[in-house]
């Protein structure tokens, strides 16, 4: 699995100490996960059949297969609003709906374009969650373990039973990164400019 970005990688220091679910490898003796951690375990379970076949599938085929799992696991409406930031309030209802649609399509296409190979990686989910400092959510810690032993930590912020942000390497907010990127697009082209850019990027990814 190469070029992972949106939901990414990890490697194996102290994995045996985790009460965890491992997907893509024989299961460890594990504490049963509930709530937010179980939600992420189920998300990974849904992804794994397609990930294992990634090298034999086109980007469009992966996009089609990933879409149900991603849209079920992620609160894409909330993520869209948070990624846009303060300008969201200035968008008309029609523009908000169009941005939500374009952003959701882009997220799935982006993931499908990056998961392009599988060589024995496995996901690990820690059943012990961390309460969010504010907002009432929970942080779910996960790892994607490569055969080489490399680990990259991926934390998920779950509110109301669905993911609202992803922290790459445990600390880098995916939404904060996108908000910075979107700010210049919105400043020059407004909501319509953002919609156009997201649609173009999705199309470009799917055409690879």
Give residue spans per PLM region.
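Short beta-strand edge/turn micro-motifs at domain boundaries
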Residues: 151-180
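Surface-exposed, charged secondary-structure patches
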Residues: 108-154, 201-208
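Bacterial N-terminal signal peptides
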Residues: 10-22
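Positively charged n-region of N-terminal signal peptides that target proteins for export
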Residues: 1-4
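Early exported N-terminus immediately downstream of N-terminal targeting peptides
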Residues: 32-111
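Sec/Tat signal peptide C-region and signal peptidase I cleavage site
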Residues: 24-30
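A mature extracytoplasmic/lumenal domain signature
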Residues: 103, 129, 143-146, 156-158, ...
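Non-transmembrane domains of secretory- and envelope-associated proteins
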Residues: 171-208
């Amino acid at each position: 699995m190469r070029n992972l970005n949106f939901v990414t990688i990890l490697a194996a220091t102290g994995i045996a100490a985790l009460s965890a679910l491992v997907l893509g490898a024989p299961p460890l003796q594990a504490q049963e996960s509930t709530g937010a951690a179980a939600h992420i375990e189920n998300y990974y379970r849904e992804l794994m059949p397609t990930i294992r076949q990634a090298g034999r599938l086109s980007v469009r085929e992966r996009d089609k297969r990933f879409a149900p799992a991603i849209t079920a696991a992620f609160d894409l409406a909330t993520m869209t609003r948070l990624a846009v930031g303060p300008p969201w309030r200035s968008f008309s209802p029609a523009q908000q709906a169009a941005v939500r649609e374009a952003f959701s399509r882009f997220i799935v296409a982006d993931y499908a374009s990056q998961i392009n190979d599988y060589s024995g990686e496995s996901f690990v989910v820690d059943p012990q969650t961390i309460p969010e400092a504010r907002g009432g959510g929970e942080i779910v810690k996960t790892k994607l373990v490569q055969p080489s032993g490399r680990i990259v930590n991926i934390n998920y912020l779950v509110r109301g039973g669905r993911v609202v942000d992803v922290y790459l390497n445990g600390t880098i907010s995916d939404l904060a990164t996108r908000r910075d990127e979107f700010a210049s697009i919105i400043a020059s082209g407004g909501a319509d400019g953002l919609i156009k850019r997201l649609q173009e990027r999705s199309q470009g990814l799917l055409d690879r």
